[in-house]
UniProtKB/Swiss-Prot annotation:
It is found in: Cytoplasm. NCBIfam families: plsX (TIGR00182). The gene is plsX. It is an enzyme of class 2 (transferase). This is Phosphate acyltransferase. Pfam families: FA_synthesis.
Length: 357
């Protein structure tokens, strides 16, 4: 079965210089993938020809006359640039011409346009960016929100927990994945009012048996793998994500420097070569690139704006896998079962608060 993914090739810090090589590498490694490259056609064709892929049978180009920049306001992105590469790529999902969309562009704009075009699932106020981080148990820790909503109310964090539970249940085959609420301590008395009120909602779900709420977790629990899911607002999540990426690069840099310090340490590096390679791979943030905008009536994936071609390729892979295993339908069913009947009416599409990832 062929899976079609639309790519916003103009998004991110590097645009086609990263998105095109990533698309070529992915489509060559995945025979069931077909990629629709959206952007300024002249630039896309030039990059394709540069990589001798201008006639690839599973790469097609759709022209878009505008580009959403990182500096664009939400109004400009949503109301004025209606033929932007981001908007056109998302429209392809809405029209059924693509199974999923990937963009490294302005996070706020991506969320606003996705909500406007695709709409949210019943009972969901705001989409949340959910992605995975590595942990000591050699498995994934799913974390949300990672930057879509910098300001949240308790009901939003509550919905994030339910959506995260639905996602992990579908992706990992766990009927009752554990949910942790990120806080400054494990004790119930700690945290701000929003976190405390959210904990009350999650405990009520736990008592009803609709959510497996572990309780409050701290930052170090993310990488311990204490819970399957960690819930927080987008401000905290985005800072945590980028701090962890920076730490991974720092550790890799320190290891490289120290093992090159003298002949003896270089010999040690040679002996431990296979282990060091494995460590480097596990700590490489590019391998964890690609977060889903959870809660939409379509699959949209957000790549880090500064991702290189290798990292962007991982974002495409996550979108491909989600479409291949029909994750959207499975999550929709799970959310419908988990969401309370009194769920809030979705907010207007343009009432979005977000940070740029």
């Amino acid at each position: 079965m062929t899976i079609k993914i639309s790519i916003d090739c103009m998004g991110g810090d590097h645009g086609p210089a990263v998105t095109i090589p990533a698309a070529i590498s992915f489509v060559e490694s995945e025979p069931d993938a077909e990629l629709i490259l959206v952007g300024l056609a002249d630039q896309l064709w030039a990059e394709l020809k540069k990589h001798k892929a201008g006639e690839h049978p599973r790469l097609s180009v759709v022209n878009a006359t505008e580009v959403v920049t990182m500096d664009d306001t939400l109004e400009a992105a949503l109301r004025r640039k209606k033929n932007s590469s981001m908007r056109v790529a998302i429209n392809l999902v809405k029209q059924g011409q693509a199974d999923a969309c990937v963009s490294a562009g302005n996070t706020g704009a991506l969320m606003a346009i996705s909500r406007y075009v695709l709409k949210t699932l019943p009972g969901v106020d705001r989409p949340a960016i959910c992605s995975i981080l590595p942990n000591q148990k050699d498995g994934p820790t799913y974390m949300l929100d990672l930057g879509a909503n910098v300001d949240c109310e308790p009901q939003h964090l509550h919905q994030f927990a339910l959506m995260g539970s639905a996602l992990v249940s579908a992706m990992e085959g766990k009927p009752r994945p554990t949910v942790g609420l990120l806080n400054v301590g494990e004790e119930d008395i700690k945290g701000n009012d929003i976190v405390k009120q959210t904990a009350v909602l999650l405990r009520a779900d736990h008592e009803r048996g609709t959510l497996n709420f572990y309780g409050n977790v701290e930052g170090n629990d993310i990488f311990k793998g204490t819970t399957d899911i960690v819930v927080c607002d987008g401000f905290v999540g985005n800072v945590t994500l980028k701090a962890s990426e920076g730490l991974g690069r720092f550790v890799k840099s320190v290891l490289t420097t120290e093992f090159k310090r003298n002949p003896l340490t270089m010999l040690g590096a040679l002996i431990a070569r296979s282990a060091l390679k494995a460590i480097s791979q596990r700590l490489n943030p590019s391998r964890y690139n690609g977060g889903s905008l959870l809660g939409l009536r379509g699959l949209v994936f957000k790549s880090h704006g500064g991702a290189d071609a290798y990292g962007y390729q991982w974002a495409i892979k996550r979108a491909f896998d989600a479409a291949k295993y029909d994750v959207l339908a499975r999550i929709s069913t799970k959310i419908a079962d988990l969401m309370p009947q009194s769920a809030l009416t979705p907010l207007p599409e343009d009432s979005v608060t977000a940070t740029e990832q």
